[in-house]
């Protein structure tokens, strides 16, 4: 019986179709998680190879067990996808046939209370995807200025009550440091009007998302990750990116559109003089989303969006 890895790979069949896997190809899973996508990729390889990255060492350990029957075809690396250039150089790989990245926090990270990602379970304020990293949610909450907290909550969480929440956090930490997830969730709740507390989603959801993004620099690493992916794909190679909130999807959409743009000469020019050529072709003009069957089995897939591009 297969171990329960607590993670259902989102948009699995859509990703496999998008990658158009060749049995002898080289593929990269840049956000390994619990290896749900990686397992199905490597099952389709004969002489091919899978390079799987994750900044969470716990994910690497779990994947090492889950992919045990295929480890002769798999290389597991503790690293960020944005460091892909260095990883491939170290491995002596000069081009790959497909890449996958599923952004955001994984289900096991959410479900493991001690990681500090969940507003429903009490734990120290941590939220680090890479537990060897220095910055924690505790430091963000207790040391960042009011203005910086307000900006993070508003920009990364799209939280309309960001000013009130940031102010309440600053008031509480003047009395004593904020140490735990439930303590922070209660502070957030206390800053919100009664009308907001009647909404379907948890009042701390957007704020926790924002702080997590800040701790892990999730938005900052997206553009270099996409540049590294484009640079290392072979012509005809595919890049598939899954995002879980609108901020990331907008960044991915904009970056892929930039990479797909050709001539930028003014329209009145009779011939192109800029010499710019598209680096990728957009396979999906609109993102692919989960169907009703998947949503019934995995409600966390509701916000997932898949975008696909092909190297020119």
Map each language-model feature to its residues.
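S-adenosyl-L-methionine-dependent methyltransferase catalytic core, i.e., the SAM/SAH-binding region
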Residues: 1-312
